[in-house]
């Protein structure tokens, strides 16, 4: 959530920065905001005036009673009672206004950082760098590559069974390919915990509405979530804040560790990681990536989260991007790093880098990780703070990133390590997790 003081100080500048984001969405009803702000100021000025009058009358009452002027004192008491009634009404209306302003701000995305390229969609994203084990460009396989579906089905990918069990955009894995998927997740966790200093966490896969509000998925993106309905004899209607949802990413529970907390400055940075399934309805993606594992309702991901001092968040963004890159480099997978433009960034991000891995069968790069600095946007919603050197509570900055998406990494391994006979060579770094196995045979 944006700092309302920033909007009060320079609304025009904030709106101009918001206008660079994805259109035609209206992020802030400026007229409604200004009307509420005007009413708030009027009420606050009137409140201060009434409080001053009440204080003066209270003093007069004591003086009048001391002089024995009982009738005048009673008249002053009546005035105080009338002022109290008006103050109570003003306080109620002020609470309503503050609630309306908070609801309005909850739908407004983060302001893009000044270093973010301006553009309306992904065509304006800027390539930062690329890497390949064989030079700047991905190597040719020397034969016409198969995509991961044609490769994977003989090896244990079963899309028909996924449809049978759950519907479209679900996948079943069996045998060696299921083990390779598990090996990738274990390898990613080991890299992030043993080499990059993250603390591994096991988290619930179901969270409450307050957790999703804190990280920005609610209320704006409820349509992208899977709600969980509690069953059994105690399945009673629940209030909105007690509604449960399947996690769309472990960013949600990990970042909420610090909700309503005040950390010591010495505790920063907090570096957390978790391997979880993620559940997304993929609303609005009808007809996109319907073949294979690229866009699923359920997929696994190793997530990285950092909670940092505000002065360190852009250093942390670069560091986390390198942490995600390290996994791809160890796997020998060609990739490029893209700086997302203002129109392509997520709701809570001030700046985002996407890592895109090379897929030979598509002859293109596809997103495999997204690393974002949310600055204080989530922390303000979460009331996540630390005690600074001056002893004052200050909002932390939060960052999150994939380290990596496991299913898409499996896709990249299958396509980049395929052999002409349809078998797949297992990357050397994964072989210890595969019992020394070097190949997935057809």
From Swiss-Prot:
Reactions mediated catalytically: tRNA(Ser) + L-serine + ATP = L-seryl-tRNA(Ser) + AMP + diphosphate + H(+); tRNA(Sec) + L-serine + ATP = L-seryl-tRNA(Sec) + AMP + diphosphate + H(+)
A Gene Ontology cellular-component term: cytoplasm
Major subcellular location class: cytoplasm
Residues that, per the record, bind L-serine: 249-251, 303, 402
Localization per record: Cytoplasm
Protein's UniProt keywords contain Nucleotide-binding: yes
Alphabetized HAMAP family for the sequence: Ser_tRNA_synth_type1
Subunit structure: Homodimer. The tRNA molecule binds across the dimer.
Protein name as catalogued: Serine--tRNA ligase
Species name: Acidovorax ebreus (strain TPSY)
Gene assigned in the entry: serS
């Amino acid at each position: 959530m944006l700092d309302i003081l920033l909007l009060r100080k320079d609304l025009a500048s904030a709106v101009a920065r918001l206008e660079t984001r994805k259109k035609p969405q209206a992020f802030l009803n400026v007229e409604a905001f200004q009307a509420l702000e005007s009413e708030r100021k009027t009420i606050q000025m009137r409140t201060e005036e009434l409080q001053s009058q009440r204080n003066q009358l209270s003093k007069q009452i004591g003086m009048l009673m001391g002089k024995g002027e009982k009738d005048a004192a009673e008249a002053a008491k009546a005035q105080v009672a009338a002022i109290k009634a008006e103050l109570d009404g003003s306080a109620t209306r002020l609470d309503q206004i503050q609630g309306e302003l908070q609801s309005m701000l909850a739908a407004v995305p983060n302001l893009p950082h000044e270093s973010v390229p301006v553009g309306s969609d992904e065509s304006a994203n800027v390539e930062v760098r690329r890497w390949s084990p064989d030079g700047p460009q991905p190597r040719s396989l020397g034969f016409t590559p198969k995509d991961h579906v044609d490769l994977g089905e003989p090896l244990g990918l079963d899309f028909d069974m996924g449809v049978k069990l759950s519907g479209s955009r679900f996948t079943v894995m069996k045998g060696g390919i299921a083990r390779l998927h598990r090996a990738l997740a274990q390898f990613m966790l080991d890299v992030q915990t043993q080499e990059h200093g993250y603390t591994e966490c096991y988290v619930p896969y179901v969270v409450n509405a307050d957790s999703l509000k804190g990280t920005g998925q609610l209320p704006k993106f409820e349509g992208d979530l899977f709600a969980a309905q509690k069953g059994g004899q105690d399945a009673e209607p629940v209030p909105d804040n007690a509604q449960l949802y399947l996690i769309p990413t472990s960013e949600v529970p990990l970042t909420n560790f610090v909700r309503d907390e005040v950390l010591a400055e010495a505790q920063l940075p907090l570096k957390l990681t978790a391997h979880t399934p993620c559940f997304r309805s993929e609303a609005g993606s009808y007809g996109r990536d319907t073949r294979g594992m690229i866009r699923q309702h359920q997929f696994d991901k190793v997530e990285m989260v950092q909670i940092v001092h505000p002065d360190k968040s852009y250093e942390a963004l670069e560091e986390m991007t390198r942490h995600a890159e390290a996994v791809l480099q160890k796997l020998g997978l060609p990739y490029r790093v893209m700086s997302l433009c203002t129109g392509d960034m997520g709701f809570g991000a001030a700046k985002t880098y996407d890592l895109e891995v090379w897929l030979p069968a598509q002859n293109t790069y596809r997103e495999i990780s997204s690393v974002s600095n949310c600055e204080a946007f989530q922390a303000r919603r979460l009331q996540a703070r630390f005690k600074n050197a001056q002893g004052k509570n200050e909002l932390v900055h939060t960052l999150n990133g994939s380290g990596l998406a496991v299913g898409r990494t499996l896709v990249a391994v299958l396509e980049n390590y395929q052999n002409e006979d349809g078998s797949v060579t297992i990357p050397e770094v994964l072989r210890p997790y595969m019992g020394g196995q070097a190949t997935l045979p057809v």
